[in-house]
Structure formats: structure tokens, C-alpha cells
UniProtKB/Swiss-Prot annotation:
<keyword id="KW-0378">Hydrolase</keyword>
<feature type="propeptide" description="Removed in mature form; by autocatalysis">
    <location>
        <begin position="1"/>
        <end position="14"/>
    </location>
</feature>
<keyword id="KW-0068">Autocatalytic cleavage</keyword>
<dbReference type="GO" id="GO:0043161">
    <property type="term" value="P:proteasome-mediated ubiquitin-dependent protein catabolic process"/>
</dbReference>
<dbReference type="InterPro" id="IPR001353">
    <property type="entry name" value="Proteasome_sua/b"/>
</dbReference>
<keyword id="KW-0963">Cytoplasm</keyword>
<comment type="subunit">
    <text>The 20S proteasome core is composed of 14 alpha and 14 beta subunits that assemble into four stacked heptameric rings, resulting in a barrel-shaped structure. The two inner rings, each composed of seven catalytic beta subunits, are sandwiched by two outer rings, each composed of seven alpha subunits. The catalytic chamber with the active sites is on the inside of the barrel. Has a gated structure, the ends of the cylinder being occluded by the N-termini of the alpha-subunits. Is capped at one or both ends by the proteasome regulatory ATPase, PAN.</text>
</comment>
<dbReference type="Pfam" id="PF00227">
    <property type="entry name" value="Proteasome"/>
</dbReference>
<dbReference type="GO" id="GO:0004175">
    <property type="term" value="F:endopeptidase activity"/>
</dbReference>
<dbReference type="InterPro" id="IPR023333">
    <property type="entry name" value="Proteasome_suB-type"/>
</dbReference>
<feature type="active site" description="Nucleophile">
    <location>
        <position position="15"/>
    </location>
</feature>
<keyword id="KW-0888">Threonine protease</keyword>
<dbReference type="InterPro" id="IPR019983">
    <property type="entry name" value="Pept_T1A_Psome_bsu_arc"/>
</dbReference>
<comment type="similarity">
    <text>Belongs to the peptidase T1B family.</text>
</comment>
<dbReference type="GO" id="GO:0019774">
    <property type="term" value="C:proteasome core complex, beta-subunit complex"/>
</dbReference>
<protein>
    <recommendedName>
        <fullName>Proteasome subunit beta 2</fullName>
        <ecNumber>3.4.25.1</ecNumber>
    </recommendedName>
</protein>
<comment type="function">
    <text>Component of the proteasome core, a large protease complex with broad specificity involved in protein degradation.</text>
</comment>
Length: 208
């Protein structure tokens, strides 16, 4: 129990991520700060990565573990694509990752993963470090998630457009930045839809 609580605390500290699913696609958003304890280790970390043009992944927890998992999932996707099985679905990728996390639960990756994208429809999955998997319409993870989730619960509407969802995700993460010292610098917002993805970057005083 003690080790489990320590792991959960490590996952909760250091970031805020948001995922939103609407009819037009999926939004993945994350702040850019990496912290080591109370020390700001890096102000410009990338926490949103792309397995394909239409599938993204982000995490609360260890960025190094995210990068390793990202490489594994990207290899799985491309291996399937060149075999008789063909491209794997977003649900298939999430299920494969859940199996990996479950198999390593005694020596776990320190992650809370969001996988989102568009295949025949928008999909958004939330996975914890034990391999538990849920499909969500909206979700927030990390140290700033209580603040971000409050914004999402107040304003989420399944009929909102992808642009409206992107704005909501941005505001949810910025709300966390204002209240949570482990979340900071700015926000990357990925808009994933049937034709690919677009990425926006927002900072406290400017848009890039």
C-alpha cells in the first residue's frame, strides 16, 4: 500500500493533461513544465506526442517513461501496418498498452496515459500505471487535475465544435497553471480530426 501511494503521488506531481472528445475529433492538451520535487527541471518539455497523424498520446508522470512507451506503441502500429493485419485501431493501441502496463505492475512505469485520436470515429482512452483502461468524453490527469476537471465539468458539451473544445482544454490547463505550482509555462493543444492533426501553443502572455 505504501509503495502504491508513493507511485500515485509521483504521477500526480508535475503536470496537468486534458483530453476532450467531441463529434468532430479529440483534443489532447498538456502544460510544458517538468519538475523534480519542488525544483523546476525544465520549462519547455513536450508532453504531447503523435503515434500517427491521427493518434496522439500524453501523460502525467514520468516524461522518460512516456517517451519509451511512445516508441513501443509507434513500433507496434507500424509493424501491424506492414503485415497482413493492417493498421491497428486506437482501441487496439490502448488495449496493447493496458496489457504492457498490467504485465509490469510490480515494477511499473510512472504514468497516467491519455491516448486520443480519430480512426472511424473520435476515441479517447485513459490508462493508469496498473493498466486499468476507461473510455472518456473528457478527462484531466496530474497534479492540476482537480482544478482542470472543475472547468471541464462546468463547460463540457458533447455538441461543442472541435475549436470550442480546444479553447476549453486550453482554459482548463491555464486554470491549473494558476493554482498548481507543478504545472506551468504554457500549453500545447492538439486538435486531432479525420484529416490529421493541428497543434497550437499558448503561453501566459502570448500565443505562438
Amino acid at each position: 500500500m505504501g509503495n502504491e501511494l508513493q507511485l500515485e503521488n509521483k504521477i500526480l506531481k508535475g503536470t496537468t493533461t486534458v483530453g476532450i472528445r467531441v463529434n468532430d475529433g479529440v483534443i489532447l492538451a498538456a502544460d510544458r513544465r517538468a519538475s523534480a520535487g519542488f525544483f523546476v527541471a525544465n520549462k519547455m518539455v513536450r508532453k504531447v506526442l503523435y503515434i500517427t497523424d491521427k493518434i496522439g498520446i500524453t501523460t502525467a508522470g514520468s516524461v522518460a517513461d512516456l517517451q519509451f512507451i511512445y516508441d513501443v506503441l509507434k513500433n507496434i502500429y507500424h509493424y501491424n501496418s506492414i503485415t497482413k493485419y493492417g493498421p491497428i485501431s486506437i482501441k487496439g493501441i490502448a488495449t496493447r498498452l493496458a496489457n504492457v502496463l498490467s504485465a509490469t505492475k510490480y515494477f511499473p512505469y510512472i504514468v497516467q496515459i491519455l491516448i486520443g485520436g480519430y480512426d472511424d470515429q473520435p476515441r479517447l482512452f485513459n490508462l493508469d500505471y496498473l493498466g486499468d483502461i476507461t473510455e472518456e468524453n473528457y478527462v484531466a490527469t496530474g497534479s492540476g487535475s482537480p482544478v482542470a476537471m472543475g472547468v471541464l465539468e462546468d463547460e463540457y458539451n458533447p455538441k461543442m465544435t472541435l475549436d470550442e473544445a480546444a479553447d476549453l482544454a486550453k482554459r482548463a490547463v491555464f486554470s491549473a497553471i494558476k493554482r498548481d505550482s507543478f504545472t506551468g509555462t504554457g500549453v500545447i493543444v492538439a486538435k486531432i480530426h479525420s484529416k490529421g492533426h493541428e497543434e497550437l501553443e499558448f503561453y501566459l502572455n502570448k500565443k505562438m
